[in-house]
A protein has these predicted regions:
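Periplasmic peptidoglycan-binding/tethering modules of Gram-negative envelope proteins
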Residues: 1-64, 148-166
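Periplasmic OmpA-like peptidoglycan-binding domain that tethers envelope proteins to the cell wall
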Residues: 32-39, 66-155, 159
Length: 166
């Protein structure tokens, strides 16, 4: 529910709960500095995301929140690995910066304990039905979470589904 009625351009994977920002929302092509519009999207998205994952009901189940950068297949693997890592790092830096007032310092402290930022280059490119790489959809930043206990995966999926369906 938190994101279903939102004007944010994102995709929620129904199987994993990972949230992907559409191509071009956060970054210009081949850049890692967050665009002004991307900053606005993060200011809207992060408080909602944190409210769901780190509320009293859920926070004890979350072992890690992952910001994962992905690129298209244009250019070398190493170039894209560097770019995807820089993008993920820039998002983490923006969220945890003192200037980011949309979440409390207490929430930032909780995040610092479990937040990671990783780059994947083009190792998880998005493939269309015809077998070709969708370069635009491959350029993305994903927000993922890991649970402390494998059996809790199903519990959290139910919780997120309930939140999404409200």
């Amino acid at each position: 529910k938190e994101f279903k009625d939102s004007e944010l351009q994102l995709y929620i994977d129904p199987e994993t709960g990972s949230i992907n920002f559409s191509d071009g929302v956060l970054f210009d092509y081949d850049q890692y500095i967050i665009k002004d519009t991307g900053r606005d999207y993060l200011r809207k998205f992060i408080p909602q995301y944190i409210k769901v994952l780190l509320n009293d009901k859920n926070k004890n189940y979350i072992s890690e929140i992952i910001i994962e950068g992905h690129t298209d297949t244009i250019g070398s693997y190493m170039y894209n690995l560097d770019l995807s890592q820089k993008r993920a790092f820039e998002v983490a830096k923006f969220i945890l910066n003192d200037d980011f007032q949309e979440i409390s310092n207490t929430e930032k402290e909780s995040l610092r304990a479990i937040l990671t930022a990783n780059g994947r280059s083009y190792s998880h490119a998005i493939i269309d039905e015809d077998g070709s790489v969708n370069e635009g959809k491959s350029r993305r930043v994903e927000f993922k979470f890991r649970l402390k206990d494998e059996e809790m995966i199903y519990k959290m999926k139910e919780i997120l589904d309930d939140e999404y369906d409200k």
